[in-house]
Amino acid sequence: GVDYEGTRSRSACSMNYSMDEYARHVVQTFSELCAEADLPHPDLISESGRALTAHHAVLVTNIVDREDPGTRMPEALAEDAPSPLRNLWNDYWMLHQSDSGRSPVEIHHDAAQALADIQTEFAHGLVSLADRAQAEEVHNSIGLLLQKRLNPGNRVHRGLLDELNEKLARKLFVNFSMFQSLPDVWGIDQIFPILPLEGLHRPPTQRALVRDMTCDSDGRIDHYVDGDGIEATLPLPEGDDISLLAFFLTGAYQEILGDMHNLFGDTDAVDVRIDGQGEPRITHMAR
């Protein structure tokens, strides 16, 4: 097997044993059976395709565009704004000015209820589309402020933080077709480690979602390897200077299963070998 997650667990995309442990158990089993039956010990040949080939390839591609959640300060309310919208605004303003004295979880619950009230009133024709749009903008702004106040080490905060990270994550539109380059993500929910190739000296303080460049809404990645296990968002360093993402452990089956999709050309390929001095050398390039 291959520990794609790095969790050393019994998950479908992980393994809770080492290669040495696996080999010892196999050899020991044959050794004991042959000794019991007084048979010669055979040469053992294993065909462990995924374990042998997964590590040999990495997909590197560039971020084409980004879509961020609204981060500007919401506009002031009209005098005749509906009551639930005023409740939302009051929560936002207290958070924006200083600590409101209420717990982040309580504020989140109250804001969610106020937004639900606005949506219900809109469905019944009691508030305008502009009111609903402003309520959603204020609700997002409350979430962004709460994100900064939540402590990931606090068990009570953790669930809410995960929810806000997913809802308020920026979307990264990346120059590849998932169906061509990572078909197992779509087909069997395979998890691959993903890492930015810049800014690794900075703490990962923002969250993102990866989207490919195809016309299909399934062209997205929903599960990401994180230090705490598998998360719904990808941790990234702060800033807009991240331009390259690497998808690791893609050497098993992805290229042979993938095919041309949405007029994407074939992915450029570079063969790299390590020479006798331990230096990487490019031995072949295909465009």
PLM features: residue spans?
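Alpha-helix-loop-beta-strand connector modules within alpha/beta enzyme cores
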Residues: 19-34
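Gly/Pro-rich turn-and-neighbor structural signature
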Residues: 6-7, 27, 39-41
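Glycine-rich tight-turn/loop motif centered on a GG-T
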Residues: 5-20, 69
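Charged (often Lys/Glu-rich) extended helix/loop segments that serve as interaction or gating elements
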Residues: 35, 39-287
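Active-site-proximal loop/short-helix segments
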Residues: 1-11, 50-58
